[in-house]
């Protein structure tokens, strides 16, 4: 019996070390950033069992077998649709401004289509303005309404949007709503999901959280897009979830969320429609291609029409494109660069690009919320401040609530707005969307919004920053080391 227990003990020890060695080899063989690999290895060696379970759960990008098969199956029809769209040469821009040219060329080569021109854009900077405009557009909708949100939180004006959407469905408008399972958990636990389905709305719970499948699909891969398409001609996107800030996370101690949305009319709605089509097919298996190009996507004749490229990220979309777009934008800056984000945990490449821009004389400003709803990200963000300040970057801490706007403005002409945070999850993992706009008029509008943010912010003083307590520096460096995992 003693021999039996001895053999079993040695087999357990051998299996334990083989498991650690196997996961180590798996990490080393995966193409990933070195800091991320080192962080994972450290976690596994310090807490082997916890680290291995965590890595197998959230360390690799698993879309799930069924969704991955759908993503592969949809591309032939999607490619044909894109080729048909290319035949509508009148909607595509033939040239761009000097500051935007490299980025638009990158997007065209990687996504297969050029930026679309002749769009009309309107920046909406308050939740009331967004929801009032949306309710009006829903009431006028005639054919179809598609929406996707990370969070839909019942309460306040969000309920008025829901009521108008149900009324549209009852009068025959085809309405589809896709919401992230984790972000919209309060919605799916409320009566609203059933009420909408009873009204005729197709409601889909995207990337459903299921702990029984934790090793088969990455549970923290989330549908983070915020998009609305109406009649294939009107579109919205930006940072705002379908929430009324007066009713959302009031106990978080960060104030009301501050967001920005863009309302668009023109052919960009068609480009966004194909993104929604791909998301819908990956999640449901149902093909929902936008209608073929026709006169409805004729561009505006006014010279003020905006040129826009839509960048989508996530499994099934061009890998690393949003990260490349941000790098290209930063390196294109010659005069000034303004960035707003609620969560700032940049890649090494992006951090160095921002610092280099400041060191070569570009006026670089980053606007962040002073109080953050994520303790981990808040501390990790602070770990980058010293390097940024030393390079000459101005860091503004917004004091008017949780600044949730994601925007980049380069030299007053190239703008990026959408759902992408400057952190690892948005850059490498989630389903995201960003609009790239080449237009000085829109740039002036965005600059006005950013100036308002700055007026409600406190400029971080580099001299005071270096005097912060030692314990804060220790906590910052700890979270900095694990920032590749956040």
Curated annotation (Swiss-Prot):
Disulphide-bridged cysteine pairs: none
Catalytic activity reported: 2 a 1,2-diacyl-sn-glycero-3-phospho-(1'-sn-glycerol) = a cardiolipin + glycerol
UniProt enzyme class: transferase
Domain PLD phosphodiesterase: 219-246, 399-426
Segments traversing the membrane: 3-23, 38-58
Claim: Cytoplasm is one of the keywords in the record: no
GO biological process, one term: cardiolipin biosynthetic process
GO cellular component annotations of the record: plasma membrane
Main location (coarse class): membrane
Pfam families tied to this protein: PLDc_2, PLDc_N
Membrane topology reported for the UniProt record: Multi-pass membrane protein
EC annotation from Swiss-Prot or TrEMBL: 2.7.8.-
Transmembrane recorded as keyword: yes
Subcellular location: Cell inner membrane
Keywords: Cell inner membrane, Cell membrane, Lipid biosynthesis, Lipid metabolism, Membrane, Phospholipid biosynthesis, Phospholipid metabolism, Repeat, Transferase, Transmembrane, Transmembrane helix
Active site, per annotation: 224, 226, 231, 404, 406, 411
MF terms (GO), sorted A to Z: cardiolipin synthase activity
Function recorded in the entry: Catalyzes the reversible phosphatidyl group transfer from one phosphatidylglycerol molecule to another to form cardiolipin (CL) (diphosphatidylglycerol) and glycerol.
Similarity comment text for this entry: Belongs to the phospholipase D family. Cardiolipin synthase subfamily. ClsA sub-subfamily.
NCBIfam families: bac_cardiolipin (TIGR04265)
UniProt-recorded name of the protein: Cardiolipin synthase A
UniProt source species: Cronobacter sakazakii (strain ATCC BAA-894)
Gene behind this protein: clsA
